[in-house]
């Protein structure tokens, strides 16, 4: 009978210690316990404090993590956030999901003349390259139209206007990674400017590929005879009417010995670009346009002339993750918002709600998650390594695991890991998304270890020097250790 009072006390103390063990403060303290010594050494060598690092490693099929270090601290994940966006889209929209770009007539067609306007209805296609836009234009020509008597009306209301400016992130609006999503985004709104020395005429020939009909290029580049010393540094590219204007100005000097020079530039506004390239291709295909371009909405009585289907979502997420395409990730993100509220222009708010709802359905609470645009090109996005690992584990258990895994860069093989983890035994054994921004270096994905076991591995470093070497050094040490488990 002397046992009776002890048992409740024992149970109570066990319960209390369990409660403490699971309380956030205690979990964080326990989190900091263990890091593989190789990782600690890498941190010391790189002069990075433990407080700036989070690591989570767990074998698939096991409940307990192998490493859980600062695992609930919200971090900026940079482009590893694309893991969350692409997996959510794959699971909620399905691998065969496609986007449609459609052309409509607002009047009758007589003798190949459209007596009215042509309405181009954007459907959010994340990968309408110049080749695919050419296919769209020629498909429309084959629908029996040669002349458009009226205007080309662009309806891009499938995505709500963002109100951001392209240079908002880093004041470099001409950089292609800054291109904003648009329901009718063609060729990522990007042209490649080419300069070729022509010694016969003593000039530098300049062109754009592709070349929208409404884009003017002022060429004031002077040719210097002789050897190449400065390369392309002598050429100054300016946008005199601002980053969204329809004019590019080239000035400076270029040496004949430098050969061809080319540089990609994001230019104009999305509808201007789509129209300019439509017009150029339409004319190349033998067509003419009577009017100009304006924005508008599709009239109810317009007649469908042609519909163009995008790549499948499984193909799209492969491009997003392998090459870290921001604009494609943002289109995926907004598409989830569009599907959440059919018939209403998609907003980032609806997209955030769609992702949060999807994760909650999968049992992933993610209270710390902050999604701004779904691409990771953000100073504000946040996630902790535990949530990131839970997303990867859900993807691993998913019926679409092969499609998701195949979308990630493969060590020493392709995408952003093409030149990393080149040790022969590691080639093709890691499928991981990279993330790099100022003060951020991150890696998240699957390590197929030498033992044949598979580990979900997430490492995020947020530190002033993170992207200048320390991040990759710490990742290398961690992955090497995981690979040996």
Q: Over which residues does each language-model region extend?
A:
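Positively charged n-region of N-terminal signal peptides that target proteins for export
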Residues: 3-9
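Beta-lactamase-like hydrolase cores
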Residues: 27-60, 65-74, 139-143
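Conserved serine DD-peptidase/penicillin-binding transpeptidase domain
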Residues: 28-43, 92-366, 473, 481-485
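Soluble periplasmic/extracytoplasmic beta-strand elements of cell-envelope proteins
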Residues: 54-58, 66-68, 85, 102-104, ...
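Residue-level preference for non-acidic, small/hydrophobic
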Residues: 63, 82-89, 152, 184, ...
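Small-residue-rich helix-loop
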Residues: 66-69, 323, 333-485
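Short active-site loop at a secondary-structure junction
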Residues: 68-88
